Amino acid sequence: MTLAFKILFPRNLCALGRKELCLFPEQNRWAAISQFSQWSETNLLGGCCLLQRRKPVLALQRGHLRPRATHLTFWPGSHVGLCTGPCAMAEQRFCVDYAKRGTAGCKKCKEKIVKGVCRIGKVVPNPFSESGGDMKEWYHIKCMFEKLERARATTKKIEDLTELEGWEELEDNEKEQISQHIADLSSKAAATPKKKAAVQAKLTTTGQVTSPVKGASFITSTNPRKFSGFSAAKPNNSEQAPSSPAPGTSLSASKCDPKHKDCLLREFRKLCAMVAENPSYNTKTQIIHDFLQKGSTGGFSDGFHGDVYLTVKLLLPGVIKSVYNLNDKQIVKLFSRIFNCNPDDMARDLEQGDVSETIRIFFEQSKSFPPAAKSLLTIQEVDAFLLHLSKLTKEDEQQQALQDIASRCTANDLKCIIRLIKHDLKMNSGAKHVLDALDPNAYEAFKASRNLQDVVERVLHNEQEVEKDPGRRRALRVQASLMTPVQPMLAEACKSIEYAMKKCPNGMFSEIKYDGERVQVHKKGDHFSYFSRSLKPVLPHKVAHFKDYIPKAFPGGQSMILDSEVLLIDNNTGKPLPFGTLGVHKKAAFQDANVCLFVFDCIYFNDVSLMDRPLCERRKFLHDNMVEIRNRIMFSEMKQVTKASDLADMINRVIREGLEGLVLKDVKGTYEPGKRHWLKVKKDYLNEGAMADTADLVVLGAFYGQGSKGGMMSIFLMGCYDPDSQKWCTVTKCAGGHDDATLARLQKELVMVKISKDPSKIPSWLKINKIYYPDFIVPDPKKAAVWEITGAEFSRSEAHTADGISIRFPRCTRIRDDKDWKSATNLPQLKELYQLSKDKADFAVVAGDEASPTTGGSSGENEGTAGSAGPCKGPPSKSSASAKTTEQKLNSPSSRGGIKPIPKHSPMKPGEKLAVKSSPVKVGMKRKATDETPCLKKVLLDVFTGVRLYLPPSTPDFKRLKRYFVAFDGDLVQEFDMGSATHVLGNREKNTDAQLVSSEWIWACIRKRRLIAPC
């Protein structure tokens, strides 16, 4: 039993978990209090008293004092409360015994420790109890010593058998076994070469790390510094400053005066406010430029006395990211404890969408934890706090860190810090606007290297040279840095062949767009790094084996940066598997498949940057230096295109085979990081999305938006009806397609009930998984709105309950006021649409006149001529059923050169027409016309608009009838919904008001291109 003293603020004495400092007597003498830099010794009171200056340097978490001390002693007129009482301290110690029941598992190997087997326990504080207490972590003897062997040098180890509580009860065999392990551990520790002693370092106010002992050096790792999901390493070019300057050599830090007001968080906040208030991006850049040149005083004579790198870094929290493991609800939860306020009130205010504003409001209202009177925090202290917070994972530790910084903040200070944690300062400005204020080439240099500190140092170095020699100004070089991700070059949507030919007058490489995951591969000797499209490390199970094949594929490559795509490929067919199969569980389901790297570009090779080389040279270089390894490392399929007809053929092929699309690249184009100078062709882009997959879904619920859409419903839960279970299923969440005016109108028009994701308020009619519990729910789905949802394709998502069917990249393209829940897409129809979308598309893209200066002739099959416009003799034959269209051409000027498909599951919209013959790029499929072919020349009219037909599945030729009826804008109803039908084929006993028709009537309407009287 040890006597402990706990020091607290008087205003917080009621909350014993607040700031505390514990001192322990040694041989009835107190330790020197002066060793704590934030505390000082004063007049004695009961043997020991402390006077607080700022805050305690040691904060013990709740649960470490056991039991809680109860006696309080006050020192009148001071800022200190003294709490005394006996408490048992949890120390790191070990025990040993025999497993009693065989239920405990080894903490290291995770296997059960068999009953009667000797085990070693490590006594640790119990993190699961508010009242404190100890718990034991059990290990096998061998596992315990393996763990200690790999532990840090400062970790307490077992050095003698007597340190194990209960060792006296052991058998001799176990004693000998443990003694042998202790001896082995000691010998290995003695044999390990000792590193140079690392001296305790201190962080100065300028952010530099210095050694307190003269002559002692601060030991830094030579490995690349990992930050924000990527590694930063020294570039090989001697012109550049080191990527990670050694402490004390940073030009930015050396120019900084930590006591100047330019370093205050208050001035940083003012800068952010000025940038946010100005809508002009040029003005935003100028404001930041003036601050970095003139400082907070605004005079050139004074200049900027702050840390340029740190200021720019904090201005870009969404670009230079750290992970803090805190979401909005967790932040509210922690601050509700700190402010001692109602968490439900804070959660309600959070619905407005800005957690930083919520924290500011409740901080100002807090009586037990009021804000500081004046803002004295510096950005160096804020940066140190953020670095510390990023290392914390336990909730109590995070709360203590937030409480420490909040005690020194004004309300607006804390608001700014929360926004830094959330990676959004709400200035409506990106990296380009901030970095352009630093140097005209800073943004391009940053995109290429992603090393902000290196870019800032080079800018300051250039400015320093200009001061010495005004005529020697050099432009900032843009170059890649090995082992640091390069911002990938991107592609813009291409909606027509004509646009592609115009954008690439030199010719283009047409490349298969694989539906996998973009990966940037960095190799430096035997070290490999893999980065995703968002510059984050790729999961190891997707890329770990490539280190065995890349050296074989590039036998002469010591260092390189490759741009590539990773996907799973079937070893039997050689075809890629669908998107999403790279997941660790889904990949296991494909036993006969390999993860393959499709390489399409090389931007760095053996210390030479290739970004400035034209694509034709980079591609040739890649072929000269790479050897394909089948189904492991392969070239992406690429074809040089100079004629529109060749491009049309490739578009036909990729969509017919179910591939994602094409990427078109100018043969003379350089690699431009972050720029959308490539083109991508996908079926949902063609002809303004006419080829995209579409479904009419019901709005079932809604979610609060974020940022500018905070406090309003801006994300909507879409679903469909399942007639079998008579429940509603979720299909997708849709956030796109509505402009601001429409969103504002929907807030009033949509009838919603707020449930705040409460599971108890989820209605019984809704089949939904927990992750999609909405903030709002419709009271009656049969009265809810129906929207046309368009996406890139139908996809599989087990999280959704519509038989796992979802929509990829959904957007609302139309509010269907003309439809209700009965006429919306139901689950059986959705399944059919999904299956149809996976079938080969029933269309073709045909290029225009061969003599055209910008296009080439079609290389497709053009047999015969289009049939006459006269009526046909009968229903279509099976041979012609797949050719639903004859020569079709775009009509509107906006879609000249586009692609007009008539997929069998996506009928044309009312009012749509096809183009006149004069269009330079024609669309359609020319096939030999037959007498039996229905009249489909030039257009699929909306013949059956408004007709709701019940078509019994037993009807002869049911599938073809259904297909053509839907293609000409008819609506089919299910048997349970026959009451809503306007026409019935067969027996109309269940709906005597409907008109009775026959299959001949359907064909006759198609031939005459209008509704005729039922026959």
From Swiss-Prot:
Top-level class of the enzyme under EC nomenclature: ligase
Catalyzed reaction equations: ATP + (deoxyribonucleotide)n-3'-hydroxyl + 5'-phospho-(deoxyribonucleotide)m = (deoxyribonucleotide)n+m + AMP + diphosphate
Binding site for Mg(2+) 2: E660
Molecular function via GO: ATP binding; DNA binding; DNA ligase (ATP) activity; zinc ion binding
Alphabetized SMART domains for the sequence: BRCT (SM00292), zf-PARP (SM01336)
Any one GO BP annotation for this protein: double-strand break repair via nonhomologous end joining
EC number annotated for this UniProt entry: 6.5.1.1
Disordered: annotated segments: 229-255, 849-926
Binding, Zn(2+): C106, C109, H140, C143
Tissue distribution of the protein: The alpha isoform is expressed in all tissues, while the beta isoform is expressed only in the testis.
Principal subcellular localisation of the protein: nucleus
Composition bias, Low complexity: 854-884
Bias type Polar residues, positions: 234-253
Chain ranges of the BRCT domain: 939-1015
Keywords, ordered alphabetically: ATP-binding, Cell cycle, Cell division, DNA damage, DNA recombination, DNA repair, DNA replication, Ligase, Magnesium, Metal-binding, Nucleotide-binding, Nucleus, Phosphoprotein, Zinc, Zinc-finger
UniProt modified residues of type Phosphoserine: S211, S217, S228, S244, S919
Interaction with DNA: region residues: 279-282, 323-328, 393-396, 426-432
Entry binding sites for Mg(2+) 1: E565
Gene Ontology CC terms, in alphabetical order: condensed nuclear chromosome; mitochondrion; synaptonemal complex
Family membership noted in the UniProt record: Belongs to the ATP-dependent DNA ligase family.
Function: The alpha isoform interacts with DNA-repair protein XRCC1 and can correct defective DNA strand-break repair and sister chromatid exchange following treatment with ionizing radiation and alkylating agents. The beta isoform does not interact with XRCC1 and may be specifically involved in the completion of homologous recombination events that occur during meiotic prophase.
Identification of the protein by name: DNA ligase 3
Record organism: Mus musculus
Gene: Lig3
